[in-house]
Regions:
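Non-catalytic nucleic-acid-binding/docking modules located in mid-to-C-terminal regions
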Residues: 35-38, 127, 142-301
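Noncatalytic, basic helical substrate-engagement surface that gates or grips nucleic-acid strands
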Residues: 1-114, 118-145, 223-239
């Protein structure tokens, strides 16, 4: 595992995320051998979500400065490695991924979504799988491939009911409040008994435990709003285009520039290139200028 405190020796620019990002991309490409590979970035803000819930994701901590500094370089490296980059201001990367999956599967392609986000379970089925990364707390578990059975076993409801489930329990990571006191077990039980969110709302007079009935009556419209928030929108423009070619010389130059020497040597060996001599390093002062606004999140697809 790459250390998060790695830095370029000449000016102490952080490179830990770059090391980990490159390793993940290359490992995934080697293990999955896809026909094409796209990476989706958030450019900040989601117009459709904020229109329903102005507090959407408002509780999230600021991205660590070291990560913000590396994001422009992460994007540059991603392109050099031959991965398509997809992003659109005002549209969440999750919606762009769901749109791409919808378009590609409709034309007969198989898709793998690489993400730990449980929301993507609603896309799984038919030609779509979800590949989740190793848990931070237990990396020995490795990457896990989730089909319909896997998603159902993990969440407790099938993919087509995950949005109903999330509308009821809420999503703390996105600042979406569910019904107060309703946890996973209760939501799964209600959905199994009543067939989905609208069935639950319609059965308010017989819902058990009885203490939830008044809350359901008074908050039904808000919970329906939750459903809009957690259901992916799949009608955004998306064109697969041509798969970019890997720029081996460009990657070698990039790794040299970032002083990622061990990664550079491995990459040169992999591509049959002569190893470059290590440059002499003259330390420079670290720039204190504010980093440019860049995407805060990347998802692999």
């Amino acid at each position: 595992m790459e250390r998060s405190n790695l830095r370029r020796q000449s000016d102490q620019f952080p490179t830990g995320a770059l090391h980990g990002w490159m390793k993940s991309l290359l490992d995934l490409r080697e293990s999955e051998k896809p026909d094409r590979f796209a990476v989706f970035f958030d450019l900040g803000g989601s117009d459709r979500h904020l229109a329903v819930l102005p507090e959407y994701k408002a509780q999230r901590d600021e991205t660590p400065e070291d990560i913000v500094l590396q994001l422009p370089e992460i994007k540059r490296l991603t392109g050099l490695l031959g991965f398509q980059i997809v992003e659109k201001r005002g549209v969440e990367a999750d919606d762009l991924i769901a749109t791409a999956v919808h378009r590609l599967t409709a034309s007969g392609h198989e898709c793998i979504i690489v993400s730990a986000d449980k929301d993507f379970g609603q896309c799984v089925g038919g030609k779509v799988l979800q590949l989740t990364p190793p848990p931070t707390a237990n990396p020995a578990l490795g990457w896990r491939r989730m089909d319909v059975a896997g998603v159902t076993a993990k969440i407790g409801v099938p993919p087509e009911r995950i949005a109903d489930y999330l509308a009821l329990v809420g999503d703390a990571s996105d600042n979406i409040p569910g019904l107060r006191g309703v946890g996973p077990k209760t939501a799964v039980k209600w959905i199994a008994e009543h067939g989905g969110l609208e069935g639950v709302l319609a059965a308010v007079e017989s819902i058990q435990p009885e203490r939830f009935r008044e809350q359901i009556r008074t908050e039904a419209d808000r919970i329906r709003g939750n459903l809009k928030l957690v259901t992916f929108q799949t009608d955004f423009p998306f064109e697969p285009g041509d798969q970019p070619a890997e720029d081996v010389d460009g990657v070698i130059d990039f790794l040299g520039e970032m002083e990622m020497h061990s990664t550079l040597r491995r990459y040169q060996v992999k591509h049959g290139r002569k190893e470059s001599p290590l440059p002499s390093v003259v330390p420079k002062a670290v720039s204190k200028s504010s980093p440019p606004a860049e995407p805060r999140q990347g998802e692999l697809f």
